Amino acid sequence: MKYTKQEARKRRHYRVRSKVSGTAAKPRLNVFKSNTNFYAQIIDDTTGTTLVSASSLNLGLKSGNIEAAKKVAEEIAKLAIAKSIVDVVFDRGGYLYHGKVKAFAEAARENGLKF
């Protein structure tokens, strides 16, 4: 039985999440992409709280393309640095490091986040 793309992504995400977790000193930068939007959160897994979040919905962008991912990365980096969060652990959410996810990661690094 072949897994669908969504099932394969969820399996990858569960496997990665068993190894990756964020702390207060180095929180987890999580990404999620839907068909129309791109979302990112910085999460402290020890307390289970979201420290910073940004999405293409909040920015008023009409699509979830590569340019939207870059703008979300700029916004989340700006918000994180304002809360003195610089070092993070990148959780790509089971997605392949390609396209929107890669553009997001590179833009976040360019704007001051370290991972």
UniProtKB/Swiss-Prot annotation:
GO terms for biological process: translation. Residues 1-20 are annotated as: Disordered. GO terms for cellular component: cytoplasm; ribonucleoprotein complex; ribosome. Transmembrane segments: none annotated. Residues 8-18 have a biased composition (Basic residues). The keyword Transport does not apply. SUPFAM superfamilies: Translational machinery components. The keyword NADP does not apply. GO terms for molecular function: 5S rRNA binding; structural constituent of ribosome. This is one of the proteins that bind and probably mediate the attachment of the 5S RNA into the large ribosomal subunit, where it forms part of the central protuberance. Part of the 50S ribosomal subunit; part of the 5S rRNA/L5/L18/L25 subcomplex. Contacts the 5S and 23S rRNAs. Belongs to the universal ribosomal protein uL18 family. This is Large ribosomal subunit protein uL18. The gene is rplR.
